Amino acid sequence: MLKNINPTQTQAWKALTAHFESAQDMDLKALFAQDSERFAKYSARFGQDILVDYSKNLVNAETMQHLFALAKETDLQSAITAMFKGEAINQTEDRAVLHTALRNRSNSPVLVNGEDVMPAVNAVLAKMKAFSERVIGGEWKGFTGKAITDVVNIGIGGSDLGPYMVTEALVPYKNHLTMHFVSNVDGTHMAETLKNVDPETTLFLVASKTFTTQETMTNAHTARDWFLKAAGDEAHVAKHFAALSTNGKAVAEFGIDTDNMFEFWDWVGGRYSLWSAIGLSIILSIGYDNFVELLAGAHEMDQHFVNTPFESNIPVILALIGIWYNNFHGAESEAILPYDQYLHRFAAYFQQGNMESNGKYVDRNGNPVTYQTGPIIWGEPGTNGQHAFYQLIHQGTKLIPCDFIAPAVSHNLVGDHHQKLMSNFFAQTEALAFGKSAQAVQAELEKAGKSAAEIAALVPFKVFEGNRPTNSILVKQITPRTLGNLIAMYEHKIFVQGVIWNIFSFDQWGVELGKQLANQILPELADSAAVTSHDSSTNGLINAFKAFRA
């Protein structure tokens, strides 16, 4: 069980509050000028392949000392131990939180209610391996005897975002199968996907633990109807559909052979499920051996997280710096900015991972918190973002801490593209940290031949204040293993922050109310009768919708 410790009542929080009075005027230029070893002191290496540079943050030794004290005073270590031991730390649902067991490559026992889960984890992995090898190798045939060419993953939330992000990130490792992902209940998503596939050579993966998720099952039945228009015989469904589920009865009723049902467990949260059977689409895209490398990379980070003192623990350091900005500097958002086109869904994935985990206003005692919890997470790949929203990060009025992520080695050595990409990666964090003074702007304008009047008019607009904080995460190359490292790093960062904020990070009750109301409204949309059962706004919207569609 997790302890209930209000972070604001700790001595460390009070010390941080006092420290902030002077630290809010901290200047990155001065910090670097005062300490030639700042980069060495405020950076960390993970193995041989990842460098995390957090030196361009508004922190000094005293800041970090108080932050580490906060982690200790909120008993973070016992929370880490409780999670990895399989205690029911998802207390509102009385569940263990063991996505880490899915990638436990040491195969050491992991107990839930006294039972080792590893034999079951390994059995599902072996089943996925055998299935994927038949599909990839062409042994698995469709209803006309043709091999599979396309795979459509039907899921939503964690059953979609994770597999989609990973398959996109690892395109350099993909095989001949073409992957498609359908999530939105908007029929357009499925309709446009079906235009690009052939019923004779398409395999559908229906990803729903309960096999009752409204969006997923609506899309699955649409895919089934489309398929049967071509195949005719319902017996053929079993050759073109597999299930990632635990509801054997519903899976069989759909027409799927339960031998092709891949289970996972209630101790696997949706947003942490890519490591489970939900990752079957990843295996079908990159092959089982590369999936194992992904698991191994995450396991390496798990071991680092469990065994490394907080002062050198990368997820802990990143989490604490995030708390410094969120709770003391008043930052409301964080940007994740990968300088790698293959990582174009990375920020979206951790938008869910972070905001669904820590978007909570009630603490573990059931009381409203009196402090800020989860930040808004957003971002796009560089350099696209530079020509879209970096203006606000550089010269806006909001403090937006940023994570810059880039590989040193590209999978596509096209001309000098990668050098140009990386020059921007390095330049942006330097510009954000150190800015450009009025004197430097004036000198530039004088050199350009501007008049004194023109210079006076332009200088204020061309000054960069700097002092915008960033982390730089430099990866040797994006591989299955290093991607596993990165994903687990961010997962554990989120966990650490939730522990310190005294909230439950592994439930998501905030998604329930809208679903309940949608189920009430759905039958009201079946006819043209005026609706009066809601507030005036909702009634007005529903009735306008009915009038528009008439």
UniProtKB/Swiss-Prot annotation:
Pathway participation: Carbohydrate biosynthesis; gluconeogenesis; Carbohydrate degradation; glycolysis; D-glyceraldehyde 3-phosphate and glycerone phosphate from D-glucose: step 2/4
Keywords: Cytoplasm, Gluconeogenesis, Glycolysis, Isomerase
Primary localization class, coarse: cytoplasm
Protein family (similarity comment): Belongs to the GPI family.
SUPFAM superfamilies: SIS domain
Keyword Hydrolase applies: no
Molecular functions (GO terms): carbohydrate derivative binding; glucose-6-phosphate isomerase activity; monosaccharide binding
Compartmental location: Cytoplasm
InterPro entries in alphabetical order: G6P_Isomerase (IPR001672), G6P_Isomerase_C (IPR023096), Phosphoglucose_isomerase_CS (IPR018189), SIS_dom_sf (IPR046348), SIS_PGI_1 (IPR035476), SIS_PGI_2 (IPR035482)
GO biological process: gluconeogenesis; glucose 6-phosphate metabolic process; glycolytic process
EC code: 5.3.1.9
HAMAP family in alphabetical order: G6P_isomerase
Catalytic activity: alpha-D-glucose 6-phosphate = beta-D-fructose 6-phosphate
UniProt keyword Chaperone present: no
Family matches, as Pfam families: PGI (PF00342)
GO-annotated cellular components: cytosol
Catalytic center residues: E356, H387, K515
Protein name: Glucose-6-phosphate isomerase
Source organism: Vibrio cholerae serotype O1 (strain ATCC 39315 / El Tor Inaba N16961)
